């Protein structure tokens, strides 16, 4: 009888304890990409970035404005609309920014329209 009572109490304690044990999901992170390097070069800094699905990239106007970040449909995953994630509006003021959250894994190549010819191109890899 005592053995059965001990097993029953142990089971009850385990059930109650399970309510207090939770798995914390990975928190999404925000990464910053500077538009224009600190040295005054026409480039994204960093030019390549690897993030996780659900993370956000914040583009910040740093130097040599104006800048934007535009994606081509041929250089994003098939399930993603380049138009929806592009920021075609130019930013002019230092510190001005915009963000994009990347939900789909894959490789995303983007560029700054005014400075594409100067090589201002970047790549984001979403795992």
Swiss-Prot record:
Q: Which residues form the Plastocyanin-like domain?
A: 29-127
Q: Where in the cell is it found?
A: Cellular thylakoid membrane
| Cytoplasm among keywords | no
Q: Where does Cu cation bind?
A: 67, 112, 115, 120
Record's signal peptide: 1-28
Q: Kindly give the membrane topology term recorded for this protein.
A: Peripheral membrane protein
Tell me if Transmembrane helix is a UniProt keyword of this record.
no
Q: Name one GO cellular component term.
A: plasma membrane-derived thylakoid membrane
Quick one: where is this thing mainly located? membrane
Keyword annotations for this protein, in alphabetical order, are: Copper, Electron transport, Membrane, Metal-binding, Signal, Thylakoid, Transport
Fetch the InterPro entries from UniProt.
Answer: BlueCu_1, BlueCu_1_BS, Copper_blue_Plastocyanin, Cupredoxin, Plastocyanin, Plastocyanin_cyanobac
Q: Which GO terms describe its molecular function?
A: copper ion binding; electron transfer activity
Q: Name one Pfam family in it.
A: Copper-bind
User: Which NCBIfam families has this protein been placed in?
Assistant: cyanin_plasto (TIGR02656)
Q: What does this protein do?
A: Participates in electron transfer between P700 and the cytochrome b6-f complex in photosystem I.
What does the sequence similarity comment in the record state about its family?
Answer: Belongs to the plastocyanin family.
What PANTHER family does the record point to? PLASTOCYANIN MAJOR ISOFORM, CHLOROPLASTIC-RELATED
HAMAP family from the xrefs?
Cytb6_f_plastocyanin
Question: What's the protein here called?
Answer: Plastocyanin
Instruction: Give the gene symbol.
Output: petE
């Amino acid at each position: 009888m005592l053995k059965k009572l001990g097993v029953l109490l142990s089971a009850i304690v385990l059930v109650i304890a399970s309510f207090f044990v939770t798995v914390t999901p990975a928190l999404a992170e925000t990464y910053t990409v500077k538009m224009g390097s600190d040295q005054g070069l026409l480039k994204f800094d960093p030019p390549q970035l690897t993030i996780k699905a659900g993370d956000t990239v914040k583009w910040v106007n740093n130097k040599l404005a104006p800048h934007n970040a535009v994606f081509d449909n041929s250089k994003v995953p098939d399930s993603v609309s380049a138009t929806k994630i592009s920021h075609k509006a130019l930013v002019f003021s230092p510190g001005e920014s915009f963000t994009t959250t990347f939900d789909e894994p894959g490789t995303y190549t983007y560029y700054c329209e005014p400075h594409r010819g100067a090589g201002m191109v970047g790549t984001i890899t979403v795992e």
